[in-house]
C-alpha cells in the first residue's frame, strides 16, 4: 500500500534541497505526499513535477499528523521538541524522519547514513525503532569520506580541523555573509579600478569597513567575510564547542562501535556558502600502505573519490567551488606523516546541504517506502 508522507519544513534550505532531490529521483511517484506548514495552512504549497500542491495542512494539528504513515521534517529543533512528544504520547505508530539534532542521541532513535550504517538501520527497523534522525553535517561528510577505514576498524583516533560553510548556520547567515561581502566591495569598488591606489590603501578601507558600526553583524555577531570564526555552537564544560563534541559522540553511535574511536578537533566557520571542508590527522592502528588505504577508501561507496596528491588535481577537484551542488565526496592530500607510518593526513570536501543534510533523509524515506 502506498504510504502517506507528511512533509514539514520544505521551504528552508535543507527542505528545498530535499524536494529538489526527491523530484530528480522520482520519489514522489512512490508516496502520497501531504505538505504541512507552521504558518500558512490553507494556502498553496510547492510545485512538484509542474503540479501545484494546494491546501497546505496545519503542522501543529496533531490529529492530521497522526494520519501520516511517515513524517519527514526539516522544520528545526523547536518544532520537534513541541510536536514529537505529543505524537508519541498519543500512541502514533508512524515513522519520524528528522533533520534536527534534538533526538539524535536518544536511545530509541537511530542516526541515519545508509552508505555507512545500513546494517545499523536495518537492525533498528527489526527491533521496531521508528525514529530516524540525520547526523551532524561534518560527521556525515567525514564518514562518507573515511567510511572504509572506519568500517574496517583501522582507526585508533582522529583529530579534525573543519572549515564549515555559512549555510550550516542557516539561510539568514548565508544572506548576512553575502551582505558583508557586498559591503566590503562597495567601499573599494572604484579604488580597484584606479591604479594609483595601493593594495594597502584598499586593505585599510576594507578593514575599517569590517569594523564599522554599520557592518552587517546581526547573525554572526562578528565579520566572516575576509575573516573566519573559530567557534561553532555553544560552549561545553570541557572547553569543546558542542559542534566539536558531536564528532566523537555521533560517529560512535552511527557506527554502533563496540570499541570507541576517539575523535576531537577544532570547528571553524569560513566564508564558503554550501560546502564544508575537513582536514584530518588520523592515527591508524596498523601500518598499511598508502595504496591499500586508497583502495579501502574508494571501494567503500560510489560517491567517494580519491584525488591524486598533486597540485593540479587538488586545485581542480578538492575545493568547495568544485563540489557545491553535487553528491561527490572527494578526498585528497593523502599521505603518511613523517611522525610515524601509522599517521595519515587527509582533506575532504562535501556539500553540507546534500550528504550533510537532505540526502540521508531522502534515502531513509525510500527505505521505509519499500518496507
From Swiss-Prot:
SMART domains: Semialdhyde_dh
Iron is among the record's keywords: no
Enzyme Commission code(s) on record: 1.2.1.11
PROSITE patterns named among the record's database cross-references: ASD
Keyword Oxidoreductase: yes
Top-level EC class: oxidoreductase
Ligand binding (phosphate): 104, 246
Superkingdom of the organism of origin: Bacteria
Active-site residues, record numbering mapped to chain: 137 (acyl-thioester intermediate), 276 (proton acceptor)
HAMAP family (UniProt xref): ASADH
Protein name: Aspartate-semialdehyde dehydrogenase
Organism: Buchnera aphidicola subsp. Schizaphis graminum (strain Sg)
Lineage: Bacteria, Pseudomonadati, Pseudomonadota, Gammaproteobacteria, Enterobacterales
Encoding gene, per UniProt annotation: asd
